[in-house]
Each structure stands twice: as C-alpha cells, then as structure tokens.
C-alpha cells in the first residue's frame, strides 16, 4: 500500500470501515440504516477505496466480509471515479484522488488470482467498471495484466476471462486486443488435458461478447468479415469436435451447452458467418438431440430409471441441471434457425422428424406432474403461460410455434406424419399396459395446439375429423386427469367447426360439467373451467342451436365454479373470474339471473386480493362485463358502491392498501354508466372521492382519484358543475390544482393521465369554468418545474398541444403574458421542456397529438412571423466538429458544446425526426443481418412485432377513447388520414418556402439526408 495512506489515523479509519462492513451484514433494518449513513461519511475519506481494496485482498477475513467490501468498492467506483456528470458530481461530492485511483488499480488485479471464484468474479467486474473510463489512457498496463493472467493457473485464467466478458471495447481496442486474446482463448479451450471443464467453459464464454463487439464496432463489412473468418476458421472445427464427443469425463454437458450458445449467438446476430458451417453443425446437433432423448424420457419424463447423472453443490457442478440446460439450449438454437430467413431452409426438409422429436421433449415429466398434484396454482401457472421457470417443455412449445409461424400450412403434412408415428407408438404402449402411454398423447395434443390458427382457417390438409375422433375417444380414460383435461380443452378450441353436431357437443359439455364435480381431481376440475372458457371464446359470435345449447349449460357450470371457489388461491381464482367474465359476456339473460351470486363473489375477491394485480385485473374485467349489461349495472352499483365508499372513508395505515384499487373499480363502474348519474354516485361516491384525495398522502390514491373524476366529468359534466350550487367545480379545481398539480407534491401525483384529465375539464366544462381555466394552466406550468419522469412531462405537454390545435390564439396569448417559473415567458419554458423530449414521447395518441400540434405551431409561426414565437430560443447540445480526440467515456463530455437556435428551427428539426419515426412505424421492420441476403420466398415470415415503446400501449383500455379524441381533433385541423403522409406533404411543401434556406443551414447531415432523400423522393 502507498506510504501516504499508512499512519495511525489510516489504521483507525480502516478498522472503522471493517466494523461498518460487518454491520452491513446484519439483518436488523435499524442497524443497516445507521450503517448506510456512516458509510456515506466514510466515502469522503481519502483512503476509503484503498482500504476496501486491501480488505478484499486479505484472505484472513471471512468471505461475506470480503464480498460486501467488493460491493461497496464497486459502488464507490461508480459514484466517485469520474465527475463528467454534473448530476453525479452534485450528488456524490468528493471524487477519488489520482493517487487513490493508482493505488486501487495496483491492488485489484491481485484479486484475479484469488482461490475463491466469487471473489475473482466480483473483482473482475470492478476492474471492468474502472477500465470503462481509465483504459487505455490511465491504465495502459491492464492488458498486459490480463495476458499474464491468461498464462497463469486456472484461478487467474478464470479471473481474466471474467474481466474480458464484462469489458467494454471500442473500435481500436477490438482491433488491438482481439488478435492477442483469441489465440489465448483457443489455447485454453483446446487444452483438455491441462485445464478443467470449468476453465475451458470460461474461455468459450469470451466469444459471445467478443463477436457482439466486432458486429457493433467494425462497421466496414470487409474488415469485419476478415476478422470473423480468421476466428471461426480456427474455432469451428474444435467447437464441433468437442460437441460431437461421446459423453464422459472429458466432455460434460456444461461445455456442450456453452458451445451451442455460441452457435445460437451467431445464428441470431451474425448468420452469414455461420452459414458456411451449417451443413456440418446441424447433423452433430441433430445426433445429440436424438441420442439424449431416450435418457431424457426414462430419467425425467417417466422416471423409470435412476438418473446416472451426478449431482453437485453448485449449479455448474450439477450434471442433472446441465443435462436439462443442454436440451433447452439445443431447442433454442433450433428456434433461432427457424426464425432466421437465411438459415431456415436448412431444416425445411426434415420438419416431420423435427416435430416428432420435439413432441417427445414436451411430454409431461413426473416432477411436473407431482408439482401439479400438490399445488393447483402451479398447474394454472404452467398451463396458462408456461410458468416463470424455463423448462424443456416450454422450449419445445416455442419450437413448434416457430414452425407454425414460419412455415404455416406447409408444416401441416409433416405434423400429421409425426402425429401418426406417435399415435402408433402410444397404441402399442397402451396395449403393453405401460402406465405412461398417455403422456405422448397429451404431448401430441399440446403440439397440435401450436398450429390451431392454420387448422381453424381451413386452408390446410389437416384431417380434423380424424384428429377430433381420436381426442374424443380419450375422454374415457378418467384415470389420467391431465390427459382428459387436455382432451376436453382441445375439443373446446375447435368447437366452432361444423363437425360438431348437437349430440357430440352435448356429450362433450356433459363430460366437462361432470369433470367439475367436487370429487374429481383438481387438475380435471381446473381443466374443465379452461374448457368452458374455450367453448365460450370459440362460439361468442355463433347463433342458433349451438348457442342455445351452451346457454342451457351455463347455470350448471356456474354451480361448479362456485363450488371450486372455497380454498382456491390467486391463480385459480383469477381463472375462475375469467370464466365468469366470459359467461356474463356470452348471454345477457344468464348475466342478469346470476348477478346475485357473481357480484358478492367479485366483492369478496376484490377485498381479499387487493395486493395481487393479476387477480384484481380479472375482477375488474368481470365488473366491466357486468357494467356493460344494463340490467346488471343497477344491482351492481347498489351492492358495490357502499363497499367502495366505506373503503374511501378509511383513515390511517388501513386505508392505503385498498383505496387506489377501490377508486379503480369505481372508475370502471362510472365509465360504463349512462347519464344522468344516480344519487348513489353523485351524492355519495363523488364527495367520497374528493374527501379521500384531499386527505391522502398516497400518490397512487391521488392518481386513481384523478382518473375517477375524469370519468365523472366525461359522463355528466353538467351534473358535476351544478353539484351543490356550483361546488362541483370548486371540488374539481381543489383536487386538480392543489393536489395533483401542486409543485410542492411529488411529481408522481401527476403520473396518471393528468393531461387527459385537464383536457377533459377544459373541453367538457370550459364554458362553465370562467377564470378557473387560467388558474388551471398556471398550475400546469408550475408543475412542470424540475420534473424527471418522462410520462409526467409528456402528460403536461399534451395539454398545451391540445390547446394549440383547438385554441391557438388564446393559448399563445396566455403563454406570452404569463411568466414562467424563472421569470422567462411561459412560452419559452413550455417549449424548452417540450422540444427536448418530443422524440422520447410514447403512446400512439400522445405522440400523434403532440406532433400535429408542432406542425400547426410551426406553420403558424413561419406564416405570420409572430414575435410571440420568433423571439423564443432553444439551447441545443451539439458535437464539436473541431475536436478530433479519440472518444472514450472520460472525454466524451468535452467533445460537445451548447448552441442557441430559434425555437422554430428546433421544431423543424423535431418534425423531421418525427417523420422518420412515423414512416418507419408504417413500413416493415428493417432487414437484419439475418435477412439482408435474401428471404425464403415461400415462408410466411415473422409476425409483426412492436417496434417502438408506443406500440406496447396499443392494448390500453383508453384506446377507443383516444381514437375518438384523435378523430375529433383531426376534424378541427387540416390533418386527415395517416400522420406520416401528412408530415411528408408538410415537409415537402416547406422545402419550396422562401424561409426554407434559413432553416436548412441549421440542419445536421443526418437531418438533411432524411429531408432530401426520404421526403423529397416520395
């Protein structure tokens, strides 16, 4: 250690750090809180990081103490190593001195030789964190240290490999380090006599991040190809060699799994480089998959043989785990090939064999069956979404889904071939009295489900009648509940088909109803509920005899479901709520006749599961379905509103758990209520909301209250305004202006749909508000101060966007005469917050409205040269073209500078970017590396996937309302139809404007390219 840190004071500080580290290991919350405060103070000590490094290296200390020391050192490095970030500098104050940094950099590499793998891995991560800012200019010797470690013992090799896995390369480093590191990695991997499996595995793990860096950083295709070819030419032969070796001491499942992971990465990210090797890789992988299938069935599926695989203390030492991981990785590899246009053709001719072997792997294992018998929740979770654990069965299902997605109807004939072979085997096993004969039948039905859409479309050659006959004949095997349950559910999925006559349908429904009996296995009872859901979903639009028959059975199913409720937990209850929702939606008369049973159950589940969002969502759906039945709405309000009002009146700790949920439920009820509002809503629920929101300190309650009030205003604004002789407006203003928009409150009070709420108030109650409009908008501006949450900023900006579209002159006057928080015109303040974030806004409605508003504002400003707009400026951070220094993280902040431009120029730049966003949203997804060299002409291709954050919001329940609002806005503007087309016309027209040259000179090269090549070529 450096002499400057060695003194009595230093020893006492070091001892204090050790004591606080020991306190951090305490389970006492109070001790932990006090320790965190003292640690914060110790971080300002000059030698803090150095002392931590020494503690880490001292093997005399207990392992937990050393581990917590590494955690604290990494945090210290992240917060105190550089001061490029102004926010970080203000938050963390003192930065590490250069002397302390040098000392830490000298000490840490010793940890790469530590005999404990956890210490090595953690030290390696900290070294990588430091290297991200210090290598190479402040730590040039790091690479020599790593190379030395690679030539050392197995501990140091593992440590060096961990550093390389976490390392962040730049272009120069990948070119300099690659040629040195790769030969070392190859040497270690190929030295099976000298190094353990674990060490060789750590060498293989370097390849994925290295390939990813080459793909991202080496943009010259020829240079990239040369580098990749030189690596793969050496490596691929050895990778295939060790993958194909017979199982034994020198070839573990762990090593094979890592090899397959490398292949999978190449298929996913760089398929053209693995393509030349696929003719050799695929037979090896196929042989491996088929060879281990027999062992998997005997050991895992049926447990007819004791596992020959050794268990271990750690996951990497457990061969049983590694065996399953290998199967999962092979299936993922195949899945990636199926979704890669360039490589998919390589398995097109073996689809029947692939489907056949995949069905083998999706059989139910004995372990999973035991879990299902012990825990109904596990059964529901696994069958609904595959559960949270990645299993062989789940991965096999994914392969079948990929075959369906990519080959469509072309996969049906291979599917039938595979099914025929399996059905023959199952019949033989059944004849031989094999107790597990049914598992392959259940797996076959599971497999066919992946192709259900193609089969139901009727465009394939699938023999549905024969298949349904086979499935129907399985219903007699009540001794196998999972088989019968799967058969029932399968029959429900295809029940829309004309193949179902009344007799057949009655028989299946009766078996399903019987399966709900209390004496049946819970697997069968739950399967019966899923079957009912399947029938109702498949036939929701059907009329005639089928519907009549289904409706006649609903009371019996309701009794069966109600009998299943006692003792059921979250996942099962959610399924039951879902079934009741389908039933209510299916028939209005049944809904009215049954609401006396269903509504109390919904209330009970709501009260019991307030902290389970999934169960609550299903309850909300059920309430929504009841609300949409006019006959049920009155009784529902009568029973539910007193409960909700009671919850809203709670005080203290008991209130916070349920009030936001109660407000959500009330919001659902109000939303589907037709005007006028009845007394229970207006005289009881409405004041309860106001009182609750005004007296809570829970942000979630405030937000939910705001949403609920928006529904009240939407349904009957006149009643709200006239409530108690005008007190309704005061109540609304009090909640919105003094609670939700109060700048003294957390920004999260506006985290809901505050923008829509304010817009609703102005549009629905505008003529009755008077001076309250100005007060409302001033509150919006005040709330915009010092915000960090993008959603909140976006919601507040949305208010002004809406007003620019509907009341341009009025809002310009307001923003030009009202001062912003810092004394500048409010227009300057609003546009600064808006324009700096527009390209990050999400949500289809929000993005379109704000873009349309900017178009209108820009057109108005250019046409009128109104000084209320032309005097507004915008500060923008741009790259300094005169700075030619090599870019690293530590110097990146100094290569940019601030420039001031007119706000109208910034609006123009933003609109160019928005055009690109909407245009790309319209077009197909850009070709990836896997697609650029041609597609399979006969493949259906990948289904559309979300491309932007906004796409993830498409299922939001506000969509219908959003679309209505959007259409109303479009009527008030000149923008009709597709927004991308409108932007294209707008930008093209502006290029002919006399002011265009002035704006053009402010554009970057990228913006000019978009404008001139993409817009004008249209």
From Swiss-Prot:
* Residues in Importin N-terminal domain copies: 35-114
One GO BP = protein import into nucleus
Q: Where in the cell is it found?
A: Cytoplasm; Nucleus
Name where it mostly resides. cytoplasm
Q: Does Protein transport count among this protein's keywords? A: yes
Mutant lacking the gene: phenotype: Male and female sterility caused by disruption of chromosome segregation and condensation during meiosis. Impaired nuclear localization of proteasome components. Males form abnormally structured sperm and fail to properly exchange histones for protamines.
Q: Which InterPro entries match?
A: ARM-like (IPR011989), ARM-type_fold (IPR016024), HEAT_IPO9_central (IPR056840), Importin-beta_N (IPR001494)
The UniProt GO MF terms for this protein read:
nuclear import signal receptor activity; small GTPase binding
Is the keyword Transport assigned to this protein?
yes
Q: Where is the composition biased (Acidic residues)?
A: 926-939
Q: Which domain of life is it from?
A: Eukaryota
Q: Name one GO cellular component term.
A: nucleoplasm
Where do the segments described as Disordered lie?
Answer: 921-950
Which keywords does the record carry?
Cytoplasm, Nucleus, Protein transport, Transport
Q: Which SMART domains match?
A: IBN_N
UniProt function note: Nuclear transport receptor that mediates nuclear import of proteins. Serves as receptor for nuclear localization signals (NLS) in cargo substrates. Is thought to mediate docking of the importin/substrate complex to the nuclear pore complex (NPC) through binding to nucleoporin and the complex is subsequently translocated through the pore by an energy requiring, Ran-dependent mechanism. Mediates the import of pre-assembled proteasomes into the nucleus during the late stages of sperm development.
Q: Which family does it belong to?
A: Belongs to the importin beta family.
User: What is the protein's given name?
Assistant: Importin-9
């Amino acid at each position: 250690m450096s002499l400057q840190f060695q003194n009595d004071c230093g020893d006492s500080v070091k001892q204090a750090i050790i004591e606080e580290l020991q306190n951090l290991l305490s389970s006492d919350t109070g001790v932990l809180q006090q320790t965190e405060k003292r640690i914060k103070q110790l971080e300002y000590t000059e030698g803090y990081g150095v002392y931590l490094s020494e503690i880490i290296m001292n093997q005399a200390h207990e392992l937990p103490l050393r581990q917590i020391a590494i955690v604290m050192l990494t945090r210290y490095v992240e917060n105190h190593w550089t001061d490029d970030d102004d926010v970080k500098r203000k938050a963390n104050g003192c930065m590490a001195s250069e002397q302390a940094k040098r000392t830490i950099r000298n000490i840490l590499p010793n940890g790469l030789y530590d005999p404990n793998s956890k210490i090595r891995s953690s030290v390696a991560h900290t070294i990588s964190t430091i290297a991200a800012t210090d290598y190479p200019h402040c730590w040039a010797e790091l690479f020599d240290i790593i190379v030395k470690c690679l030539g050392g013992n197995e501990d140091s090799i593992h440590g060096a490999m961990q550093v390389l896995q976490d390392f962040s390369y730049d272009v120069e480093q990948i070119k300099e380090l690659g040629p040195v590191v790769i030969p070392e990695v190859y040497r270690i991997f190929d030295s099976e006599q000298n190094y353990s499996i674990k060490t060789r595995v750590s060498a293989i793990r370097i390849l994925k991040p290295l390939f990813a860096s080459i793909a991202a950083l080496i943009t010259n295709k020829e240079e990239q190809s040369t580098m990749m070819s030189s690596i793969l030419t050496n490596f691929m032969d050895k990778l295939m060699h060790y993958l194909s070796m017979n199982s034994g001491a020198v070839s573990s499942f762990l090593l094979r799994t890592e090899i397959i992971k490398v292949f999978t990465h190449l298929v996913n990210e760089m398929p053209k480089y693995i393509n030349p090797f696929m003719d050799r890789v695929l037979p090896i992988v196929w042989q491996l998959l088929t060879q281990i299938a027999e062992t998997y069935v005997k050991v895992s599926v049926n447990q007819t043989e004791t596992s020959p695989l050794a268990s271990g203390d750690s996951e990497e030492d457990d061969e049983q785990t590694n065996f399953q991981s290998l199967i999962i990785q092979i299936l993922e590899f195949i899945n990636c090939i199926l979704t890669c246009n360039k490589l998919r053709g390589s398995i097109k001719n073996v689809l029947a064999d692939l489907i056949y072997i995949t069905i083998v792997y999706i059989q139910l294992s004995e372990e999973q069956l035991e879990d299902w018998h012990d825990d109904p929740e596990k059964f529901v979770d696994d069958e609904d979404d595959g559960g949270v654990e990645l299993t062989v069965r789940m991965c096999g299902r994914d392969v079948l889904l990929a075959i369906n997605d990519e080959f469509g109807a072309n996969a049906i004939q291979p599917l039938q071939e595979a099914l025929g072979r399996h059905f023959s085997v199952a019949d033989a096993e059944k004849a031989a009295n094999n107790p597990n004969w049914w598992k392959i039948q259940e797996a076959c039905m599971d497999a066919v489900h992946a192709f259900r859409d193609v089969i139901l479309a009727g465009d394939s050659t699938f023999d549905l009648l024969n298949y349904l006959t086979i499935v129907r004949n399985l219903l007699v095997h009540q001794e196998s509940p999972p088989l019968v349950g799967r058969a029932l559910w399968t029959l429900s999925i295809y029940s829309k088909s004309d193949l179902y006559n009344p007799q057949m349908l009655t028989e299946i429904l009766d078996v399903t109803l019987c399966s709900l009996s209390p004496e049946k296995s819970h697997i069968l009872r739950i399967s019966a509920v899923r079957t009912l859901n399947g029938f109702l979903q498949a036939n929701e639009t059907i009329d005639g005899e089928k519907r009549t028959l289904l409706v006649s059975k609903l009371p019996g199913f309701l009794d069966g479901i109600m009998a299943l409720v006692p003792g059921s937990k979250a996942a099962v209850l959610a399924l039951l709520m879902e079934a009741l929702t389908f039933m209510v939606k299916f028939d209005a008369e049944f809904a009215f006749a049954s609401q006396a049973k269903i509504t109390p159950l919904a209330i009970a589940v709501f009260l019991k599961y307030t902290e389970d969002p999934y169960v609550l969502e299903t309850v909300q759906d059920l309430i929504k379905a009841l609300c949409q039945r006019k006959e049920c709405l009155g009784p529902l309000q009568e029973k539910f509103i007193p409960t909700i009002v009671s919850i809203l009146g709670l005080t203290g700790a008991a209130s916070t758990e349920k009030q936001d949920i109660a407000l959500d439920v009330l919001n659902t009820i109000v939303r589907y209520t037709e005007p006028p509002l009845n007394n229970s809503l207006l005289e009881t629920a409405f004041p309860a909301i106001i009182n609750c929101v005004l007296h809570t300190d829970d942000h979630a309650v405030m937000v939910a209250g705001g949403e609920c009030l928006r529904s009240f205003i939407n349904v009957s604004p006149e009643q709200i305004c006239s409530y108690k002789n005008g007190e309704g407006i005061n109540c609304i203003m009090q909640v919105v202006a003094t609670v939700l928009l109060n700048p003294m409150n957390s920004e999260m009070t506006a985290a809901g749909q505050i923008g829509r709420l304010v817009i609703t108030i102005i549009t629905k109650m505008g003529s009755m508000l008077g001076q309250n409009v100005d007060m409302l908008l001033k509150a919006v501006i005040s709330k915009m101060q010092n915000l960090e949450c993008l959603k909140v900023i976006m919601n507040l900006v949305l208010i002004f966007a809406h007003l620019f579209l509907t009341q341009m002159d009025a809002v310009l006057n307001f923003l030009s005469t009202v001062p912003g928080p810092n004394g500048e015109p409010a227009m300057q303040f609003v546009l600064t917050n808006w324009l700096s974030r527009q390209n990050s806004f999400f949500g289809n409605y929000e993005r379109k409205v704000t873009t349309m508003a900017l178009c209108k504002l820009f057109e108005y400003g250019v046409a009128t040269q109104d000084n209320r707009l032309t005097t507004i400026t915008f500060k923008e951070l741009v790259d300094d073209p005169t700075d030619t220094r090599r870019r690293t993280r530590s110097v990146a902040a100094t290569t940019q500078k601030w420039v001031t431009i007119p706000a109208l120029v910034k609006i123009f730049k933003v609109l160019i970017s928005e055009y690109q966003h909407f245009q790309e949203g319209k077009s197909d997804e850009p070709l990836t590396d896997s697609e650029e060299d041609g597609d399979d002409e006969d493949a259906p291709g990948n289904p559309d996937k979300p491309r932007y954050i906004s796409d993830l919001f498409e299922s939001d329940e506000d969509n219908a309302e959003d679309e209505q609002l959007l259409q109303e806005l479009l009527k008030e503007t000149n923008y009709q139809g597709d927004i991308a087309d409108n932007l294209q016309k707008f930008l093209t027209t502006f290029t002919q404007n006399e002011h265009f040259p002035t704006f053009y000179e402010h554009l970057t090269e990228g913006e000019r390219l978009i404008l001139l090549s993409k817009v004008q070529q249209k």
